């Protein structure tokens, strides 16, 4: 349902305004102003984000109690498409409950870039996602206004004995505003850039932001090969940046989805900083493809690390990227997921080369 605002209470509130007591506003009808207010209960994107965040948290709690109580998210790339989807859902199911919209980075790259259709490599404009979030909620608010306008017309035409039932429909109207899961890719830069972009997306109405652990300027579509990940400290800094954006804007229960692309990523941009054996940097580096070396077998320009008391040389490509050991993707996904959930993420996403429930289930069991 929408907010607690009811038509009758809003009419009474407006009538109490001093200017309605005299003749200055004699041509203004409180009833009409109240209807307009009911049609526009979400004044800003922050209002939308707060409202939808509470819905998403409630749905997450319901799913934790009963996995049959799941949500469904539909992808969309234009406000009109999103609007028509929600109108159809509400008409068919009688409710928009547990129905979300999903705003994918690849859709934005392919269909919303000023450069024209692009591959999913974060080459589109940084502001494209936030613009689409704002557009979607503009169209969804219009869907509310349209349906409520129909109810207002019914109320005007209805005989006295039928007006209360129509009034109840208005007061219990279910909005088309639903949560949007918005893809921020890898943050489009460092943590400062991530914070600024997340803030813009939240101001547009996003209550949920999905972020991935790829290198921002090397980012690939989740289904493509050649992906490059970053150490956990870099990724967690961006998760923190998104959380700070939520908190600054007053969306205290905003949702962060941490996506790991490690299953299809055989490369890392850098060796993680580690201060002691077993810390998160050391765990990340333990997956590197290395060979033990001595002073005699070292080459000019080699990068060497001390790993478990041994001097080793990580395999470095001509691109200056470092290679992980083969077959470590699932183990890295598990470490990524646990680390993200322990450090501020609310949900996790494990990117696979194709939908594979068994594969995901095995990693969750592990």
Walk through the language-model features, giving the residues of each:
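Alpha/beta enzyme core
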Residues: 3-366
């Amino acid at each position: 349902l929408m907010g607690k605002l009811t038509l009758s209470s809003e009419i009474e509130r407006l009538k109490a305004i001093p200017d309605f007591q005299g003749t200055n506003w004699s041509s203004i009808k409180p009833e009409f102003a109240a209807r307009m207010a009911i049609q526009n209960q979400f004044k800003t994107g922050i209002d939308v984000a707060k409202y939808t965040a509470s819905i998403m948290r409630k749905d997450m709690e319901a799913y934790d109690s009963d996995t049959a109580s799941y949500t469904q998210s539909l992808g969309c790339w234009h406000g009109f498409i999103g609007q028509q989807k929600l109108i159809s859902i509400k008409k068919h199911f009688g409710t928009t409950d547990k129905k979300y919209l999903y705003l994918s980075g690849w859709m934005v790259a392919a269909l919303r870039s000023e450069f024209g259709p692009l591959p999913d490599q974060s080459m589109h404009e940084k502001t494209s996602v936030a613009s689409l979030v704002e557009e979607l909620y503009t169209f969804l608010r219009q869907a509310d206004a349209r349906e409520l306008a129909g109810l207002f017309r019914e109320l005007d035409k209805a005989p006295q004995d039928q007006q209360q039932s129509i009034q109840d429909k208005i007061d219990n109207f279910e909005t088309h505003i639903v949560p949007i899961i918005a893809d921020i890719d890898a943050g489009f830069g460092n943590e400062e850039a991530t914070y600024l972009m997340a803030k813009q997306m939240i101001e547009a109405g996003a209550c949920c932001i999905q972020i991935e652990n790829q290198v921002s300027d090397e980012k690939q579509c989740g289904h493509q090969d050649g992906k490059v990940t970053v150490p956990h400290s870099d990724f967690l800094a961006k998760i923190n940046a998104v959380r700070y954006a939520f908190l600054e804007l007053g969306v205290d229960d905003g949702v962060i989805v941490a996506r790991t692309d490690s299953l299809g990523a055989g490369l890392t941009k850098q060796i993680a900083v580690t201060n002691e054996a077993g810390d998160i940097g050391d765990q990340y580096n333990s997956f590197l493809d290395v060979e033990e070396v001595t002073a005699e077998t070292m080459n000019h320009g080699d990068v060497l690390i001390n790993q478990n008391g041994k001097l080793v040389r990580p395999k470095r490509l001509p691109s200056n990227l470092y290679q992980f050991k083969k077959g470590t993707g699932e183990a890295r996904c598990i470490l990524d997921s646990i680390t993200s959930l322990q450090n501020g993420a609310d949900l996790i996403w494990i990117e696979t080369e194709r939908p594979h429930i068994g594969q995901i289930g095995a990693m969750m069991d592990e």
